[in-house]
Amino acid sequence: NYDAFCRMKESAYFINVGRGPIVVEEDLAKALEEGQIRAAGLDVMRIEPLPIDSPLLKIQDSSKLIITPHTAWATSEARQRCVDVVTENIKAFLRGEDKNIVRG
């Protein structure tokens, strides 16, 4: 991972919202500390909760790393969209309409 971070532009922002284990956190922390990339945003980590000795927790500059453990989806807009979709699905059901049909 460290070599990949070194190939990125120094202005790069690394975002991981998919799978924690795909990132070598020690390499990410090193790349951030050395300025190889600008910043990172993580919604998933290799081990959750993040261990107290994680190198990510040692990063002093808070502008370099944002960690949102599985809460990045929880903006007010995202929650409102969930409510809107559920409401529309219930209304469609009450009207006898098919909605979001998945066929194999």
Residue ranges and their predicted role:
Residues 2, 6, 11-104:
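Rossmann-like dinucleotide-binding domain for NAD(H)/NADP(H)
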